[in-house]
């Protein structure tokens, strides 16, 4: 059963209903549910499907491709010696298929592009020279290495330039979708617990699938993150390595951003890392934004060139705050931290990030979903005449109204007293 993803399913269905061949690129961070979405949408039925081999060399990739062709029904398929031959074999198989629409699903496509394999040129030839000239091919590519798909396919300046006909940048679940997912698994969670779980795991479906019935939220987090063999105990390194060819530079940037709650300007990032030029930094920041690890925003009174980059990936932030600091390898770290000052300080900041990830839902709750608006944050450094202040969410509406939003994480409804009201008015 697919939770949410209605718009994404519609895109996939429309590709099949099209009168022309379609080239669909699906990308997004590791564990966000890309493969599951595609397989469930098509009922696990494809004319041809293949998954690249993690760390396989060219010979192994080609052998695996031939095995997939045999599994699809090409019984006497030979082992190709090159990718040109491999895609020629695929074309021959598809020509003989009786499927009205021939759905070709190539999963983990970036893994197939091994050094000196000439994969890209053969892939270009398959689409440009054959598939795009027909009306019955639906080519769906997918992969966690988002930077590869963006640079080598979507933003390619060579043979694949403007060839992708439909894109799906698969996003994490919203809080509502996580609630639906938890209910589908039979997990009994209050909305307070759902919010805290989201603050730790974000909206990554795979992470939520690891939660077990019968355990408290704290016990679940201990088991999957802090236990010696926890399923997510080493997720941080695997996450960035799966997405980026040279993950170290991306980790450098998110590490710097992780130290500044409100985010940093480009100049501040360059100063903090002391190793990146503007050009190199632009590429890394763009790819981190594509993958949903950071967001780029403008302060309410700032110009575009002073845009601020903020780390928003919940798991990464949780890693920096707690997992990386768990030097004693305490397997019950989270259970022992409940109601501690450290936990309370973290939860307030994490709840602010949760709200910032749901500005569309906040606008809907305020009844202004249909009003054109921009979302900003505002901060003022302390000086000799006044204290510093910060407003995390400003909704600047086209109807000449500005909504000022303060986020407070509380077990019960938060009551604004006279002192706090005056504090807000001073801002």
Where are these regions (language model features)?
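A cross-kingdom feature that marks ATP-driven nucleic-acid transaction machinery
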Residues: 300, 307-427
């Amino acid at each position: 059963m697919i939770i949410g993803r209605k718009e994404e399913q519609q895109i996939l269905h429309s590709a099949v209903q099209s009168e022309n061949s379609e080239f669909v690129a699906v990308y997004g961070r590791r564990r966000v549910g890309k493969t599951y979405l595609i397989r469930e949408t098509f009922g696990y039925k494809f004319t041809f499907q293949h998954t690249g081999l993690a760390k396989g060399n060219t010979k192994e990739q080609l052998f695996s491709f031939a095995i997939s062709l045999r599994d699809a029904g090409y019984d006497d398929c030979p082992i190709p010696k090159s990718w040109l031959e491999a895609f020629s074999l695929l074309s021959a198989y598809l020509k003989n298929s009786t499927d009205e629409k021939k759905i070709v699903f190539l999963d983990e496509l970036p893994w197939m592009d091994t050094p000196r394999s000439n994969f890209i040129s053969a892939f270009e030839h398959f689409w440009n020279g054959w598939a795009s000239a027909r009306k019955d091919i639906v080519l769906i590519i997918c992969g966690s290495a988002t930077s590869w798909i963006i640079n080598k396919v979507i933003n390619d300046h060579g043979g694949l330039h403007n060839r992708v006909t439909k894109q799906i940048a698969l996003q994490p679940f919203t809080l509502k979708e996580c609630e639906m997912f938890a209910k589908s698994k039979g997990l009994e969670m209050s909305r307070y617990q759902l919010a805290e779980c989201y603050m730790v795991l974000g909206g990554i479906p795979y992470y939520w699938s690891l939660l077990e019935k019968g355990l408290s939220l704290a016990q679940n987090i201990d088991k999957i993150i802090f236990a010696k063999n926890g399923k997510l105990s080493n997720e941080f390194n695997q996450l960035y390595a799966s997405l980026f060819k040279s993950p170290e530079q991306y980790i450098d940037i998110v590490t710097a951003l992780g130290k500044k709650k409100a985010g940093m300007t480009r100049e501040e990032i360059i100063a903090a890392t002391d190793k990146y030029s503007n050009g190199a930094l632009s590429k890394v920041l763009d790819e981190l934004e594509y993958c949903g690890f950071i967001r780029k925003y403008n302060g309410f009174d700032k110009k575009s060139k002073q845009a601020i980059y903020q780390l928003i990936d919940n798991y990464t932030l949780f890693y920096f705050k707690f997992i990386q600091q768990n030097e004693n390898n305490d397997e019950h770290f989270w259970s022992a931290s409940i109601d501690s000052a450290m936990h309370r300080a973290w939860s307030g900041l994490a709840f602010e990030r949760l709200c910032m990830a749901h500005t569309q839902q906040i606008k809907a709750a305020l009844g202004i979903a249909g009003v054109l608006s921009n979302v900003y944050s505002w901060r003022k450094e302390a000086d000799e005449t006044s204290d510093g202040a910060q407003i995390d969410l400003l909704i600047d509406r086209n109807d000449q109204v500005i909504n000022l939003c303060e986020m407070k994480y509380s077990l019960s409804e938060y009551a604004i007293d006279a002192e706090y009201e005056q504090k807000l008015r001073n801002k």
